[in-house]
């Protein structure tokens, strides 16, 4: 339908490229042209263009519509008969004539162009406009139109068409022999411009329609309904009683919806992507629920069901990032008295109620905080916050890109990046402390940025570890499964939060990767962690000055007690026991997944594998590529001081890079002076390139021969004290 916008758009579209296509030879104009006062959508013309005389647009050539891409000045446009023409004029901006003066100029220009008297010209003019555009509409032939090209002040000559096809009405103020009847004011619509003023609404009212559900008038505890969708880069935020987005009740929403206190449904903000989430939360302060999405789902849909009661509050933040493929993922309920987050099971795998597992096959949808193939997460919250006390799960996140899973009694203040994994599987070498118990990873093809604090990496050709992604196989606590991943750029964070007993305080600046936190740990980790080489090999973890009892172990790979068992190969699961040859410590839940050309004894004993594992294992792929970076960096800003937790790690300035990863396989020890399983207030003994030295406190000795104590040692527990 030809709208009033046709005429306005024809004025707008005279861009330089179109001028070149439709320009004709002409002489310079005696009238000093300046940019005309056109509506907001009008493209401002260049100086060179304005100095040129009017352009006569050939309707047989012009095809482009900047609004729909389908408009053309062909006779199929209603009213475009090449007998009705719109002629716009360019008036000096610094000396703009009055409306009456403009109308007089229109009449004189029409008379001069047609070489007729002023009275005859008034009969030719059927409409004028001095507001949205400056010009007049007159009836004439194509041959007569040619005469207007060189007239002073004439800007565009365009065939006119109906703005109201049903009533066959042209736009502008109606002009009948000098008598002017104001016409309808054009208003913007999603299709262009509407000419009927009665259908127009103020911009503020339209904005409210976009951002506010129809049931805005209801009370905060009774908000139900659906609203309009907004653009992907917009947000809809509603504040109620001074509290932003605190929901006390249950809600169902699609996209990014922040409701008030009570029950509600809404789609006030929808980032492309389709999912639904439901949840319940009984909280002293409420539960913060946020759904985030990035790329749209091509096939498949994720449904999430969570029930997380907490003593003081629940934080449930989801980021639906399905990769482009097929699949479905469902989540079972996971009650927790301490705010444990339950983030999904994939493809119908069943796990005990105290477990959280991710198992993602090739091409299946990725669970929350999982970065799939090329998926990118928009940035959200930036600043860290402080939260309450006791059995309290809190979550503070910068712009995440990856997977984040949290459980109870943890405090993290992380910085930097760690464990880059390539797009087609790879070997991971976590930083020291990466193997806190009760976690497992199961990865399909590809890799992601993974936190070095948790174990059980299973990366290979889609073969999960036992208990990591197989139906009916339980994992002790948590499992991850990743699809085709994308490299994540490094970031920086601002450490901050300080929590207390049984307090999950996760303070993450702009993290980009997958992070799993487990119980009873305090971590203040900085810098970069280990990176795997392009081809297979055995690599020791970066040393972050953490507390690991026991004597030095062998040479080559030095893995500490209560940490990790490493499995490399092509994803064939193999359950094994990890036993320390010196202290006799056995692995509670470790997995030996061995592949091509790599021989690891069943008991994990020998000079090449001095491995002690408690509840974690790694399963790695063969021939993976990863950036050849080095790990073991410690940042300057300490954080994460807690009470009643099992350990407190504080790192400071990086000194010497450690754990370099090379292009080909091989056995590598931990950083200089950090071989074996050292304990605090002990000498660090090592072999080969490692040296032995004595320190009073090795909490901050990651690749450094100095003793980097925290700013205030009284604020941290002695790392050599056991809980």
Curated annotation (Swiss-Prot):
Species in which this protein is naturally found: Arabidopsis thaliana (Mouse-ear cress)
Stretch forming the transit peptide: 1-64
Disruption of the gene: reported phenotype: No visible phenotype under normal growth conditions.
Subunit-structure text: Heterodimers with MORF8/RIP1, MORF1/RIP8 and MORF3/RIP3.
Compositional bias per record (Low complexity), positions renumbered to this chain: 459-474, 682-695
Keyword Ribosomal protein attached: no
Location within or outside the cell: Mitochondrion
Pfam families with a match to the protein in the record: MORF_dom (PF21864)
Protein name per UniProt: Multiple organellar RNA editing factor 4, mitochondrial
One example GO MF annotation: protein dimerization activity
Cellular component per GO, a single term: mitochondrion
Keywords annotated in UniProt: Mitochondrion, mRNA processing, Transit peptide
Main location: mitochondrion
Biased composition (Basic and acidic residues): 191-204, 714-723
Region (Disordered): 180-303, 318-474, 663-723
Top-level lineage group: Eukaryota
Biological process (GO), any one: mRNA processing
Family: Belongs to the MORF family.
Functional summary from the UniProt entry: Involved in organellar RNA editing. Required for the processing of few RNA editing site in mitochondria.
Source species taxonomy: Eukaryota, Viridiplantae, Streptophyta, Embryophyta, Tracheophyta
Biased composition (Polar residues): 219-233, 273-303, 327-365, 373-430
UniProt key word Kinase: no
This protein's encoding gene: MORF4
């Amino acid at each position: 339908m030809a709208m009033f916008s046709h005429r306005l758009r024809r004025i707008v579209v005279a861009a330089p490229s179109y001028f070149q296509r439709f320009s004709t030879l002409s002489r310079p104009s005696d009238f000093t042209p300046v940019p005309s006062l056109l509506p907001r959508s009008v493209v401002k013309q260049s100086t060179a263009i304005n100095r040129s005389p009017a352009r006569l647009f050939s309707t047989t050539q012009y095809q482009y519509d900047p609004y729909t891409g389908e408009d053309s000045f062909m006779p199929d446009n209603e009213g475009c008969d090449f007998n009705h023409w719109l002629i716009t004029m360019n008036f000096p901006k610094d000396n703009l004539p009055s409306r009456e003066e403009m109308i007089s100029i229109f009449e004189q220009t029409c008379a001069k162009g047609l070489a007729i008297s002023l009275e005859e010209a008034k009969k030719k003019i059927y409409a004028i406009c001095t507001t949205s555009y400056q010009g007049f509409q007159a009836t004439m032939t194509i041959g007569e139109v040619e005469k207007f090209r060189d007239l002073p002040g004439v800007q565009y000559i365009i065939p006119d068409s109906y703005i109201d096809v049903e009533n066959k009405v042209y736009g502008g103020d109606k002009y009948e022999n000098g008598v002017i009847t104001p016409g309808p004011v054009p208003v913007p619509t999603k299709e262009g411009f509407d000419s009927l003023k009665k259908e127009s609404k103020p911009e503020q009212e339209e904005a409210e329609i976009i951002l506010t559900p129809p049931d805005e008038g209801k009370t905060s505890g009774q908000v139900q309904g659906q609203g309009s969708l907004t653009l992907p880069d917009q947000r809809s935020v509603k504040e109620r009683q001074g509290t932003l987005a605190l929901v006390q009740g249950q809600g169902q929403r699609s996209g990014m919806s922040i409701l008030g206190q009570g029950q509600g449904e809404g789609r006030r903000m929808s980032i492309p992507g389709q999912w639904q989430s439901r949840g319940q939360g009984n909280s002293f302060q409420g539960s913060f629920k946020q759904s985030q999405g990035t790329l749209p789902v091509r096939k498949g849909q994720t449904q999430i069901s969570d029930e997380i009661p907490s003593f003081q509050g629940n934080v449930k933040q989801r980021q639906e990032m399905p990769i482009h493929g097929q699949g479905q993922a469902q989540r079972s309920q996971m009650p927790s008295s301490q705010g444990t987050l339950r983030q999904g099971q994939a493809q119908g795998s069943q796990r005990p109620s105290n477990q959280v597992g991710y198992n993602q096959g090739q091409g299946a949808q990725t669970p929350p905080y999982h970065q799939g193939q090329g998926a990118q997460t928009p940035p959200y919250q930036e600043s860290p916050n402080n939260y309450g006390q006791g059995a309290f799960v809190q979550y503070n996140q910068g712009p995440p890109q990856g997977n984040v899973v949290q459980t109870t009694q943890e405090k993290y203040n992380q910085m930097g990046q760690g464990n880059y994994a390539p797009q087609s599987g790879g070997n991971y070498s976590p930083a020291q402390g990466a193997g806190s118990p009760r976690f497992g990873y199961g990865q399909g093809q590809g890799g992601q940025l993974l936190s070095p604090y948790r174990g059980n990496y299973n990366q290979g050709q889609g073969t999960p570890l036992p208990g990591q992604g197989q139906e009916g196989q339980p994992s002790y606590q948590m499992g991850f499964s990743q699809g085709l991943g994308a490299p994540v750029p490094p970031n920086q964070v601002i450490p901050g939060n300080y929590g207390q007993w049984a307090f999950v305080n996760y303070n993450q600046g702009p993290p980009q990767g997958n992070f799993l936190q487990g119980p009873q740990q305090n971590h203040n980790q900085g810098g970069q962690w280990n990176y795997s080489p392009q081809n297979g090999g055995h690599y020791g973890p970066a040393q972050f000055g953490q507390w690991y009892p026991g004597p030095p172990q062998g040479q080559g790979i030095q893995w500490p007690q209560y940490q990790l068992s490493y499995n490399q190969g092509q994803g064939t699961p193999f359950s094994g026991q990890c036993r320390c040859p010196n202290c006799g410590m056995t692995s509670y839940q470790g997995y030996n997944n061995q592949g091509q050309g790599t021989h690891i004894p069943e008991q994990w004993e020998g000079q090449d594998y001095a491995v002690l594992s408690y509840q974690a294992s790694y399963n790695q792929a063969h021939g993976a590529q990863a950036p050849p970076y080095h790990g073991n960096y410690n940042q300057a800003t300490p954080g994460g001081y807690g009470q009643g937790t099992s350990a407190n790690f504080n790192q400071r300035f990086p000194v010497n890079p450690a754990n370099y990863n090379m292009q080909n396989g091989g056995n590598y020890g931990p950083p200089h002076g950090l071989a074996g399983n050292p304990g605090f207030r002990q000498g660090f003994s090592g072999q080969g390139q490692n040296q032995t030295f004595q320190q009073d406190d090795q909490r901050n000795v990651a690749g450094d021969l100095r003793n980097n104590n925290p700013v205030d040692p009284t604020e941290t527990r002695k790392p050599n004290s056991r809980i």
